[in-house]
Amino acid sequence: MANARSQYRCSECRHVSAKWVGRCLECGRWGTVDEVAVLSAVGGTRRRSVAPASGAVPISAVDAHRTRPCPTGIDELDRVLGGGIVPGSVTLLAGDPGVGKSTLLLEVAHRWAQSGRRALYVSGEESAGQIRLRADRIGCGTEVEEIYLAAQSDVHTVLDQIETVQPALVIVDSVQTMSTSEADGVTGGVTQVRAVTAALTAAAKANEVALILVGHVTKDGAIAGPRSLEHLVDVVLHFEGDRNGALRMVRGVKNRFGAADEVGCFLLHDNGIDGIVDPSNLFLDQRPTPVAGTAITVTLDGKRPLVGEVQALLATPCGGSPRRAVSGIHQARAAMIAAVLEKHARLAIAVNDIYLSTVGGMRLTEPSADLAVAIALASAYANLPLPTTAVMIGEVGLAGDIRRVNGMARRLSEAARQGFTIALVPPSDDPVPPGMHALRASTIVAALQYMVDIADHRGTTLATPPSHSGTGHVPLGRGT
């Protein structure tokens, strides 16, 4: 016997809600929710779990060896994943079109097969011949026989292929191109993506097959599809990079098997993609002599310390209001630092055109780069080059104070490893690596006084670091 009940369904994304709403809660469209009558069995049915069910057992009796991570063979990717891919896990890799997602995953399949494990690469966007052409270009088309290709867009056919091939790794490129006849909506829609992901996830966990899904992103950078897509999977990775450059980064957003804030660096080239063990060299402008308007900092991207360079240029305005051009740094934060220099250090920089940029396309998003931005602006204002062995780390407050940042010991260790011998930092009890002198400034005025001191000692080490109280102001003249 069945009971009739009412539901409310969006005509655009097919999202179902229990009550009527003027605006769809899923896609945000207005006036698309209509009432529909559905039949349900008396008592209803229970929703099947995505993960295989098991009885209650003591945690000490659970065998965890079968779920140990399997290395992919790509060290930078394994770093983000927490050592490798866990059998039965589902990983979502999202990124902009053309950033290199397919190239990276084809390289993963190649390394996976080289270790004697079978991989199935399913594409709903390319034919098997097109995938083979790309595999030949990056050098992984003929070396191994354990890579299987399938050009399919029906999820049930993909599940049959998994049963037939019996792979240890399945790559689906992409989840938005897969469809199922058991769900309404168009391919790539919210309902279809949710149903396809649930079916693939259930199959992966039931067969202990590692599954990697490729996801599209919207113009705002968010993962396309329902929010539940990120809840269904075990790992969410974002693949980022400037299409005009070769640097690529994989950021962990969610990871049930490791840290969720790791970052892997890659270099995309004509013959594939390679991991970068020491990416700091990409973010530094190698020059033999110091140049005014530059400052070095160490930022933490997740848990990874990266050395970056800030460049500043001040120019006389050509009529009208002064310009502010910022690249790689938050414009609002750059304006705040300029205001602090104007107010507390009495540097008349607001009347100038201000240009700020980072080297190598690096994005400085954390406050630890504030001090480097301030020093770069002051150095450009006074035309005072700083030694290339100095690094600046610290947050600048509106009161002109220099504040501590987390992970200072890790940052200083990375700076020392890169050959820096002078560190301008806020007061703290963090240990300083051997061979490095720490100049501790509590205010922006004291930091600028230290800047003048180390500029006078260019090319030499400071045997005895100077001490400043941080009161008053630094009479920096405008350089020519």
Curated annotation (Swiss-Prot):
Function recorded in the entry: DNA-dependent ATPase involved in processing of recombination intermediates, plays a role in repairing DNA breaks. Stimulates the branch migration of RecA-mediated strand transfer reactions, allowing the 3' invading strand to extend heteroduplex DNA faster. Binds ssDNA in the presence of ADP but not other nucleotides, has ATPase activity that is stimulated by ssDNA and various branched DNA structures, but inhibited by SSB. Does not have RecA's homology-searching function.
Family the UniProt entry places it in: Belongs to the RecA family. RadA subfamily.
Zinc fingers typed C4-type, residue spans: 10-27
Domain observations: Has a putative N-terminal zinc-finger, a middle region with homology to RecA with ATPase motifs including the RadA KNRFG motif, while the C-terminus is homologous to Lon protease.
SUPFAM superfamilies, sorted: P-loop containing nucleoside triphosphate hydrolases, Ribosomal protein S5 domain 2-like
Leftover remarks: Was identified as a high-confidence drug target.
Keywords annotated in UniProt: ATP-binding, DNA damage, DNA repair, DNA-binding, Hydrolase, Metal-binding, Nucleotide-binding, Stress response, Zinc, Zinc-finger
GO biological process, one term: recombinational repair
Keyword Transferase attached: no
Record's protein name: DNA repair protein RadA
